Amino acid sequence: MSIGVQSSGINISNAELSRLVDAGMSELGGKAVRDDGRALARAEAALAAVVGERVSPRRDAGAGAQRVELAQPKPAAQTRATDRRTVSGMEREHRRLAASQMPAVTGMHEALVQRHVSPGGAKTPGEGGATRVGGDAPRFSFAEDKAFDAMIALGIAMQKNVQSDLVMQGKLTTLAHDAMMSAAAQDRSIGAAQMTAAIAGGALQAATSLGGAVQQMKGLGTKSMSIEKELKPQAELKQFHAEQALELRGINKPVLSNDEVSHVKVKRETGESVRHEIDPGGERMSDEHASVLAQEAPARQHRIDMHGMRHEQNLVKAGRQQMKGDLIQSGGQVGKNQIDGASAQQQGAERAEQKEDESAQQTAMAAASARDEAAHRGRDAAQKAIDAAKSQVANDNAVAAQVAGNLRT
């Protein structure tokens, strides 16, 4: 069995203790029984010299024995190196702390870094005349009560920081949820825009197609009316004109048969009878009749020509109506394309906002994860420091108890 003091670097084995005791006992030899008190005093003095203690020879008034006063243990080089590594780790952890952490945690880390250094790293005014680093604040190791209290305070602050981390993580999670809901709303908005564009484009195209069909039907009606009112009378006039022309030439006139009379007697008002011969061949027309037919022929031809002109005008009007119908239908298609383009532009803007919301969601989740990881690292570091402080204090207490027990025996 051996007794180890971690903070001071002292390691005393049973063999060493036996050697120290035997050293006192060998000097006495056979007088050990008679001179028990002196041997024990010399053994205690030798033990105190090994562990770095200062012996003050004080004579007890009653028993006449020496009292031993233990001096402050001096840390070994191994303990200093351990303390330096601990401080370096705390400094790195302090630099990792984000500005959004609780001020109590950041301040506690800073205080520990400033106050906790290895005993060899800071010189007191009694060691070389140098002042303490960091002002007049005393430097101490974890083995001292103040350092242990500071680590306990750090643990309490870290426990308080857990609540702050949870609140912040909840806020970041809520932000990510809101971003996700906004992205879903953008999806619904895109679907609604597509449906609106489809309905509006279909309605516009249907209306323009109907309007174009109506105009084309009007054009066809104009053509039908022109045929009925212009071409039909024109045909009748042409037929009558042709018949009159045949009569002027003496064709198709009535011809007398052989048994009919060849003359007509006409009695005038004076009582005188006048005989008129009838041309049996029907080859001649009276001059009066021929004159009337000849005067009416140009007027009939003019009416025939006017019917033709009005028919052509009606055809032009019908063509314009049909063209108007085609333009209305084409305009409906153009309007539908414009609606589709506007809907596509709106959908593009909605998709851009959706991507922004998704990016915000990912950023919030990443920030929450990073903050949780940083808080976890900070808690682990604080817990390790607290465990190290507890272990070192426990070791020091055990060593002190063992030494005190050995001195009593």
Curated annotation (Swiss-Prot):
InterPro entries hit by this protein: BipC/SctB
Coiled coil feature spans: none
Keywords of the record: Secreted, Virulence
GO cellular component: extracellular region
Domain of life: Bacteria
Biased composition range(s): Low complexity: 360-369
Biased composition (Basic and acidic residues): 370-382
Compartmental location: Secreted
Region (Disordered): 268-287, 330-396
Pfam families from the UniProt entry: IpaC_SipC
Family (UniProt): Belongs to the SctB/SipC family.
Protein name: Effector protein BipC
Native source species: Burkholderia thailandensis (strain ATCC 700388 / DSM 13276 / CCUG 48851 / CIP 106301 / E264)
Classification lineage: Bacteria, Pseudomonadati, Pseudomonadota, Betaproteobacteria, Burkholderiales
